[in-house]
Amino acid sequence: MARKSIIARNEKRKKLVEKYAAKREELKAAGDYQALSQLPRDSSATRLRTRCVLTGRGRGNYRKFGLCRNMFRKLALEGKLPGVRKASW
């Protein structure tokens, strides 16, 4: 499981991205890169990391489910993910 501080940092970044999204789009459209560079660094969407909602793992995530591969497999085998079945052919 990821450290609590790493998860909290990512949540803080999500809030900043949401707060400055409109202003950032406006500045991009106007081509005002000087003002854009004055915005907080963490308000850029590229600094966000998709993390597992259960464990906070930052790698091997399925966006559709919001889970890392380990938790996805565990929950799928337990039958807790509706519509997901193990493939067999």
Curated annotation (Swiss-Prot):
rRNA-binding is among the record's keywords: yes
GO cellular component: cytoplasm; small ribosomal subunit
A molecular function GO annotation: rRNA binding
GO biological process, one term: translation
InterPro entries linked to this entry: Ribosomal_uS14, Ribosomal_uS14_bac/plastid, Ribosomal_uS14_CS, Ribosomal_uS14_sf
Pfam families tied to this protein: Ribosomal_S14
Keywords for the protein's UniProt record, in alphabetical order: Ribonucleoprotein, Ribosomal protein, RNA-binding, rRNA-binding
Family per record: Belongs to the universal ribosomal protein uS14 family.
Function of the protein: Binds 16S rRNA, required for the assembly of 30S particles and may also be responsible for determining the conformation of the 16S rRNA at the A site.
Subunit structure: Part of the 30S ribosomal subunit. Contacts proteins S3 and S10.
Protein name per Swiss-Prot or TrEMBL: Small ribosomal subunit protein uS14
Protein's organism: Chlorobaculum tepidum (strain ATCC 49652 / DSM 12025 / NBRC 103806 / TLS)
